[in-house]
Amino acid sequence: MARKWNLPFLLLPLVLGIPLVRGSNPLPLVVNTWPFKNATEAAWWTLVSGGSALDAVEKGCAMCEKEQCGGTVGFGGSPDEVGETTLDAMIMDGTAMDVGAVGGLRRIKNAIGVARKVLEHTTHTLLVGDSATKFAVSMGFTSEDLSTNTSRALHSDWLSRNCQPNYWRNVIPDPSKYCGPYKPPDFLEQNNRAHKEVDIHSHDTIGMVVIHKTGHTAAGTSTNGLKFKIPGRVGDSPIPGAGAYADDMAGAAAATGDGDTLLRFLPSYQAVEYMRGGDDPARACQKVISRIQKYYPKFFGAVICANVTGSYGAACNRLPTFTQFSFMVYNSLHNQAIEEKVDCM
């Protein structure tokens, strides 16, 4: 799926001295993963109120953190093996190629806000764990418990099911039958990589891309990660080029899904590079999915892409339980946030 506008055609009336018809330019543009409408609207109204592309991404993702979108963004969701909720987020400025990100952030609700502070007040790209929390507190954020009755109940139920599912392999006791603690066996058998069936509702990261009316780009993500992950695990979301990527010379992209798989292919960076090479956004997204399918045909994932002329698209990998991917779009041709769907390939 794609919506395309030909830039030379848009510029022709200006060359001839003819004013453009109001609303004929699709910019600005907001696209985000999943039907998180309030996040889309928060980003859009930030833009029309005079905010930058970076401001829009931050406000949009922050709305999802506040609303706990799908239980997979923000506090109170996706407890790890010990029952704690931690957060990952990143934000990227495609004009300056600056990035701020946090991974395994504890006790701070506004992860995307902390990522913005990393971008603005340090020369680093990524801060993690307890030290990221200390940084956040120094920046004025409040330290508070991220667990809720809902996340505690999820963890309790998981323990009652012998810690299933989990993400261990080649350890004893058998992780498919028992809880840990685990340790490596004396002799490691070399067997084929096992594929774990995934719950698609445990991966609904918000990824957002914004193209400002000036052509400036930004992208970002926010997530509470994988349910019942091994403590310390960080997925694709806070990694530039994996979770999201933006470059004013081409466009922006964001990914959602099985972060451990996506991280190995830098799908957002690859999508932007495909657009730089001339592919329209829909085709760029499709090529990214095809590239991963060659190695992981059963992976769960989707990508959104937008170029600097206002064209956008998306693609996803088809599974028995995942045949369509929903994403949100708001541009100057719409008077509201629109949910669009693409058939998986």
Swiss-Prot record:
InterPro entries: Ntn_hydrolases_N, Peptidase_T2. The keyword Disulfide bond applies. CDD domains: Glycosylasparaginase. Disulfide bonds join 64-69, 163-179, 285-305, 316-344. Its EC number is 3.5.1.26. Substrate binds at residues 233-236, 256-259. Pfam families: Asparaginase_2. The active site is at residue 205. GO terms for cellular component: cytoplasm; endoplasmic reticulum; extracellular space; lysosome. GO terms for biological process: proteolysis. Cleaves the GlcNAc-Asn bond which joins oligosaccharides to the peptide of asparagine-linked glycoproteins. Belongs to the Ntn-hydrolase family. This is N(4)-(Beta-N-acetylglucosaminyl)-L-asparaginase. The lineage of its organism: Eukaryota, Metazoa, Chordata, Craniata, Vertebrata. The gene is Aga.
